[in-house]
């Protein structure tokens, strides 16, 4: 490659982006962030403790140092950086689940893109279909990893949500499809006049109740088991629907929205928290994030939607978008009422 060719350099930079996720995945799966949590250690000691090959472990930790998640101290000794600490399962704001999720996508969903584009069928759609969520509930470790990850991201979303949306007119809130209730907990802690519940599959109930109790909300927050496809969420003044619709194609998404419409009543409000894609894409950091998110959902049979696409979907489900509160890569909130 010619060093003075900016077009070639740009493509090479894109090509070189393939390997970091695999390093992070290896570090995470081998539980090296946990092993280094108590302080620096030699590759030899880590290898003996974890039953690993010393030389290959040294090479992996060296690669982790190049990525900034480990620190090479010399003499084959390594420490964990602040970034690497986020790969620990018990870290505040842990990104362990994100690493494992996108690692799976790099081996499956993204690799399937050519076939999906040829056929229009998502190879992993069963994973996020109703049967797939039931199957996920049988894998307790994977289920716990996923929902712990969602708790962290949900709390970040809730901070922004409570800043831009006034909940004073509401008394009850349902976090529909809310997992362990990270979003609900943060909203209730910010708006102390509210009570609420999580509506999700029965497999989530134990983890959700434990999390809500741990947040000091046992008296104000509960759990209602159920599925959008079997009936509406329990009645409430306000439904929260965060990053749910993008999991599904239009037909299933319409069913979910119609289920919410049936449960919310004439005076109820639905806050649809999702990404709204730009009308046109350009080579910018935010647009790359939008594209990554959309192709991720492509692999699972879902999709991100533009404002026009989302509004069309809402109207088809008997709902009326009132306004967009906040509009950014991380947070777009559409306030919705029954039509």
Question: Model-derived features: where do they sit?
Answer:
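Alpha-helical subdomain
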Residues: 1-72, 167-168, 172-339
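Conserved Class I S-adenosyl-L-methionine-dependent methyltransferase catalytic core
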Residues: 2, 8-29, 34-40, 48-49, ...
């Amino acid at each position: 490659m010619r060093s003075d060719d900016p077009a070639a350099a740009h493509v090479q930079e894109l090509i070189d982006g393939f390997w970091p996720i695999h390093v992070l995945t290896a570090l995470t799966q081998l539980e090296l962030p946990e092993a280094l949590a108590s302080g620096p250690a030699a590759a030899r000691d880590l290898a003996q403790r974890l039953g690993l090959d010393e030389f290959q472990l040294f090479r992996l930790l060296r690669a982790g140092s190049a990525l900034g998640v480990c620190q090479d101290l010399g003499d084959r000794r390594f420490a964990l950086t602040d970034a690497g600490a986020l790969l620990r399962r018990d870290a505040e704001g842990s990104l362990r689940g994100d690493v494992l999720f996108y690692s799976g996508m790099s081996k499956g969903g993204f690799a399937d893109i050519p076939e999906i584009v040829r056929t229009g069928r998502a190879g992993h759609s069963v994973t996020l279909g109703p049967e797939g969520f039931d199957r996920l509930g049988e894998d307790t470790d994977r289920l716990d990893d996923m929902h712990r990850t969602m708790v962290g991201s949900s709390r970040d979303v809730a901070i922004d949500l409570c800043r831009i949306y006034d909940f004073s007119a509401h008394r009850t809130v349902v976090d529909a499809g809310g997992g362990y209730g990270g979003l609900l907990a943060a909203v209730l802690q910010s708006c102390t006049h509210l009570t609420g519940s999580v509506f999700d599959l029965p497999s989530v109930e134990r983890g959700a109740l434990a999390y809500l109790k741990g947040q000091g909300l046992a008296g104000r927050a509960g759990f209602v088991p159920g599925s959008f496809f079997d009936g509406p969420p329990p009645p409430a003044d306000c439904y929260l629907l965060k990053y749910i619709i993008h999991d599904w194609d239009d037909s299933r998404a319409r069913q979910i929205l119609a289920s919410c419409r049936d449960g919310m009543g004439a005076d109820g409000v639905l806050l649809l928290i999702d990404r709204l894609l730009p009308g046109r894409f350009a080579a910018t950091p935010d647009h790359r994030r939008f594209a990554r998110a959309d192709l991720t959902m492509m692999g699972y049979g879902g999709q991100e939607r533009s404002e026009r696409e989302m509004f069309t979907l809402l109207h088809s489900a008997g709902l009326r978008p009132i306004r967009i509160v906040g509009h950014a890569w991380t947070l777009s909130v559409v306030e919705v009422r029954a039509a």
